[in-house]
Amino acid sequence: MFDLKQTLLLISELMHLFLLRLQNTSVMDPQTADRSPKITLIKVSNGPLTGSRKRPSEGNYEKEKDVCIQLFDQWSEADQVEFVEHLISRMCHYQHGHINSYLKPMLQRDFITALPAQGLDHIAENILSFLDARSLCSAELVCKEWQRVISEGMLWKKLIERMVRTDPLWKGLSERHQWEKYLFKNRTTEVPPNSYYRSLYPKIIQDIETIEANWRCGRHNLQRIQCRSENSKGVYCLQYDDEKIISGLRDNSIKIWDKQTLECLKILTGHTGSVLCLQYDERVIVTGSSDSTVRVWDVNSGEVLNTLIHHNEAVLHLRFCNGLMVTCSKDRSIAVWDMASPTDISLRRVLVGHRAAVNVVDFDDKYIVSASGDRTIKVWSTSTCEFVRTLNGHKRGIACLQYRDRLVVSGSSDNTIRLWDIECGACLRVLEGHEELVRCIRFDNKRIVSGAYDGKIKVWDLQAALDPRAPASTLCLRTLVEHSGRVFRLQFDEFQIISSSHDDTILIWDFLNVSTNGQTEGRSPSRTYTYISR
């Protein structure tokens, strides 16, 4: 085996050959030519042809090497690389091994340690900030310098902040556990040390795993609001945030509840028929009623700001966003409105085409989607209000629908739920399990939650439902049974479901703050009741 010095000697000899060729093309001194070494070619096993000659004296070798280096330095980088590649291609595999051993430490440098030495700590921190939790744990064990960069760069804090920005579950936990006050602060403000965030991360992971297990197993804490309607009983619609729940009732009223205490804060009256649908934002509440009107209320004062009279029969559903509102009615029509302000709302277009009551609408910047008792879902262009396509498949009227991105999920009085690709109109999956009309449905990135006239709420695995290979028996994760009447409306997030029913109650199913009670046969497991009557 050649050692490294022998390999370098061989390279210099090949360079000498190259010089000889250069000299052969020019006028040469006869005496110099006579002293040229005699070269013979030998074949090395498993390698290319290599030159073999008697080693020149040290003096000649040094001179020849210096000449080669001078010529090499005069070439461009591309020519240098090409020349070295040519030399390497003429070597044997064991010579390649020697060169690899020589180059390896040059190529595998600890740049994380080297950067701070050059005053570039921020670059080292930025590089390591892209690591996930497992890789960050490993990086801490590399050496003390890496551990110092991670600690002083507060990289565990940055990792948690990145998760909070991109994952709704992390964001919700940060708000509920109040450790968001330690996030998104610069280094000049007083923040805990890196060790605080290092220990916080596994606690968050444990919380997330517990919440996911609670959803799968149906473990929840249950709170119940008894609405105590005076005349007609039933809660037709609701929406909630962290502070309040706003509900529309069969007795024509709108009730606003404190989310924490479950106390009724305010009752809005004005409709002369049942409040069938509602939506609110930070400024207004918009409601639709069986009295055929749409009313706009100030969300803080409860004052009526506007009343829209257009539909000839009950307003069954409405949605508004970014200055656009869409309403639908038992009169079979869909109305598209421009909302310049709460008091300046004008009718843009009326969409007709359904042959029965239009029960639900949803929209985004691309499509308006409507579903009807005529068993069809129709798709319209949001910008032009022109008809695009019809989705056919349900065997009876469609009662509920949600649309987001390319996915439409609908529920019908044929007791099924269907998933659709809105772009091609294909039905992707049929979910079966409810025993009566599916009245309300919502989905997020993980789950579909449905409520039906059978009084049951079902939680479905969305990703499995979108996988055609998944068996139908694996799709329904849990059935929740607490309502004693038809489920009219529900909304959910990562931590809870809030539902309303014909039984005049609003139920809050909390999957975050769960007691340790055991399961009860035939009912939803792990329930703790809070009864509020107002």
Curated annotation (Swiss-Prot):
Pathway the protein acts in: Protein modification; protein ubiquitination
Pfam families: Beta-TrCP_D (PF12125), F-box-like (PF12937), WD40 (PF00400)
Top-level taxon of the source organism: Eukaryota
Keywords of the record: Cytoplasm, Nucleus, Repeat, Ubl conjugation pathway, WD repeat, Wnt signaling pathway
Primary location recorded for the protein, binned into one broad class: cytoplasm
Gene Ontology, cellular component aspect: cytoplasm; nucleus
Domain F-box positions: 121-159
Subcellular location as annotated: Cytoplasm; Nucleus
InterPro entries registered for this protein in UniProt: Beta-TrCP_D (IPR021977), F-box-like_dom_sf (IPR036047), F-box_dom (IPR001810), G-protein_beta_WD-40_rep (IPR020472), WD-F-box_domain-protein (IPR050995), WD40/YVTN_repeat-like_dom_sf (IPR015943), WD40_repeat_CS (IPR019775), WD40_repeat_dom_sf (IPR036322)
WD repeats: 228-267, 268-307, 308-347, 351-390, 391-430, 431-463, 480-510
Entry-linked CDD domains: F-box_FBXW1B, WD40
Keyword Nucleus belongs to the record: yes
GO molecular function terms listed in the Swiss-Prot or TrEMBL record: protein dimerization activity
Gene disruption: observed consequences: Knockdown of both fbxw11a and fbxw11b results in abnormally developed pectoral fins and heart edema by day 3 post-fertilization (3 dpf). At 5 dpf, knocked-down embryos show periocular edema, small and misshapen eyes, and abnormal development of the jaw.
GO biological process, one term: sprouting angiogenesis
Record region (Homodimerization domain D): 59-108
PROSITE patterns: FBOX, WD_REPEATS_1, WD_REPEATS_2, WD_REPEATS_REGION
Subunit structure: Self-associates. Component of the SCF(FBXW11) complex.
Function: Substrate recognition component of a SCF (SKP1-CUL1-F-box protein) E3 ubiquitin-protein ligase complex which mediates the ubiquitination and subsequent proteasomal degradation of target proteins. Probably recognizes and binds to phosphorylated target proteins: the interaction with substrates requires the phosphorylation of the two serine residues in the substrates' destruction motif D-S-G-X(2,3,4)-S. SCF(FBXW11) mediates the ubiquitination of phosphorylated CTNNB1 and participates in Wnt signaling regulation.
Domain writeup: The N-terminal D domain mediates homodimerization.
Protein's name in the database: F-box and WD repeat domain-containing 11-B
Source organism: Danio rerio (Zebrafish)
The encoding gene: fbxw11b
